[in-house]
Amino acid sequence: RVIMKYKLLVLDVDGTLLNDAKEISKRTLAALLKVQQMGVRIVLASGRPTYGLMPLAKSLELGNYGGFILSYNGCQIINAQNGEILFERRINPEMLPYLEKKARKNGFALFTYHDDTIITDSPENEHIQNEARLNNLRIIEETEFSAAVDFAPCKCMLVSDNEEALIGLEDHWKRRLNGALDVFRSEPYFLEVVPCAIDKANSLGALLEELDVKREEVIAIGDGVCDVTMIQLAGLGVAMGHSQDSVKICADYVTASNEEDGVAIAVEKAIIAEVRAAEIPLDQLNAQARHALMGNLGIQYTYAAEDRVEATMPVDHRTRQPFGILHGGASLALAETVAGLGSMILCQPDEIVVGMQVS
């Protein structure tokens, strides 16, 4: 049994897990499935809504391996296996009329998320439409926003192409709303409003406590300013190669960019390559094969592990031709025996090995 140094792998999504085409590369997918098979659990940590992360969680098979979704920049954590909410913080609905008033005064669009929908007063806004498309959400128009939102949202978003105006409101709210709500810009055109003291690291800390996992047993990978706190929290904090210098300086290690399989490279180096091949006891293997073809030919395993398989075969009346040359059939039997065991060693519990020929 392999003792894993790391138990939790926390991944930002956009700009980290996904390439610029918003896809998980084949190499990254293979690496992430591999580490889950090795016992490492994955957390998707994103500003996206929970619904928007579900397809990615399915692609990574988080439900099969006990992974988690940390959504809305930390406002909610759910167990991908059973949908149980493990952590949640929401905005007090009494704050919504104030947010709506400020948005209208500044000419900003306003929206929030609810299940598989976006509720907004500006359905034609290009950025809101892109957000809906990215997360596969329906847009519901509500001209009286605060009256229509009759629930406590995880977060609200103000939208404008006037970045200077957004910065001005952000600075004002950081003073005015201190202790009530937190605000930050996730994009030049987005100003996010979330419950106080919510970020990826604080929510991740709650998950670590729930799972009884130490910080030293966590790897966190991200590319943005919103990822800095979780990168600093983790035992191994990794910044993507295209990150700003302010992010890279906070990391223990800088990997390649999201266009160059940066997540796969980091995971292969930090987790997969660190697992040493463990020898498999040979006595049982050789005993089981005594009455099979390999036993009849005198083949004996001398070493078996994930890195290689070795076996010996005597040159005698069973395996040789005249003048001591090995019989082709015996050589093939030796090759098939070694390759077959190697395939079974590498096979995961949910995989099936089919017949093969090796020459």
Spell out what each predicted region is:
Residues 1-13, 30-33, 37:
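Non-catalytic pre-domain segments flanking phosphatase-related domains
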